[in-house]
Amino acid sequence: MATHQILLRTGDPRDVGTVDALMTAAFDPRYGEAWTRNQCLGVLAMPGVRLTLALVDDRPAGFAMVRSVMDEAELLLLAVDPAFRRRGIGTALLRAVIAEAQMSGIADLHLEVRANNPAVALYTEQGFAKVGERRGYYRGRGGEAFDAHTYRRAV
């Protein structure tokens, strides 16, 4: 089996097309989690927002978007293209987010995730603990409601 190196690089608003394509591939539309292109551009224009892209063989494989304010940061989005899953890309992105938070003097890192999202295993594996629940937070295409859980990790 061939080994493919994961390259992480800082992104910017010019990468919104890549982010949009990765969200389309990674987020199941029935849960209503993907952001629009304009939402991404708006958030990327905000102070304290950092986008990290993961590339495998020069192909976009995933991304993480984080917003920092004072000594707290929130993981806004993390996505890995299904064609690249189970290769450590999500772990590499999350570890990069944690390392950047440590270097920036962040005390706490927060995130919110659909309760039945398989990524919960990644977050708990990386030291996040559930601290809250938002009932019916996500609305699917058919109007179904899905709970969200909030997680926190000291940095």
Language model segments and positions:
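Conserved active-site tyrosine of GNAT-family acetyltransferases
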Residues: 123-124, 128, 151
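Short glycine/proline-centered loop/turn elements that form peptide/ligand docking sites
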Residues: 90, 94, 116-119, 136-142
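Short amphipathic helical patch at the helix-1/turn junction of helix-turn-helix
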Residues: 80, 113-114
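Conserved catalytic-core motifs of GNAT/GCN5-like acyltransferases
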Residues: 110-112, 129-149
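Accessory recognition modules or surfaces
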Residues: 87, 91, 142-153
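Acetyl-CoA-dependent GNAT
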Residues: 2-6, 10-85, 94-100, 104, ...
